[in-house]
Amino acid sequence: MMEFKIEQIAICPMDPDRAKKLLKEMGAVDWVEDHVVATGEVFGIKVTNEANLSFNYDLFGGKEFEILDYTEGNNWLGQNMLTHGKNCVSHLGMHCTSEELISWRKFFEERDIAVAQEVLTDSHTNPVIAGKRSYNYVIFDTRYILGVDLKFIVRINKE
């Protein structure tokens, strides 16, 4: 049986720098930064988008807490921001294999829950990742049911 495990919580604040400053003042001192370029689809429309990602591993018991700041291109939050505004919890995420993702796709399809955004990352600036791996991100449009979207993250190691 499939089981969703929250491994990542992401927020999309109006002012990412101010949000990070406040979180640092609250004890989240160490951040890992990455600028990502990705291509794929947002609600079925082909896109390329860019985002600044900031990760902290202290706030959430060693799991990922992410500040998401889209800088270029269309993204699924742009659609949701029309009704929900920019300050939001972006998603709850889980890492999985490509095989597990196939099962999750079927699970959500059977419940008429659409893919909000699916992208493959083209580039990363984080030296731990850059040139070594990419990701397939699939975000399901569960915001109207759960109040937040669900993201499945597949690591793709480069050989």
Regions found by a protein language model. Give the residues of each.
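Short loop/beta submotifs within extracellular cysteine-rich repeat domains
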Residues: D30-W31, N75-W76, I145-L150
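Histidine- and/or cysteine-centered catalytic micro-motif in compact active-site loops
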Residues: V36, L68-E72, T97
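Short, composition-biased local secondary-structure segments
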Residues: L23-M26, D69-W76
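Vicinal oxygen chelate
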Residues: M2, I6-M14, S54-D69, Q79-E100, R105-E159
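Extended intrinsically disordered, low-complexity coil regions enriched in Ser, Thr, Gly, Ala
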Residues: P16-H35, L82-N87, T97-D122
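A cross-kingdom feature marking solvent-exposed beta-strand/loop segments within repeated
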Residues: V32-E50, G73-L82, T121-N136
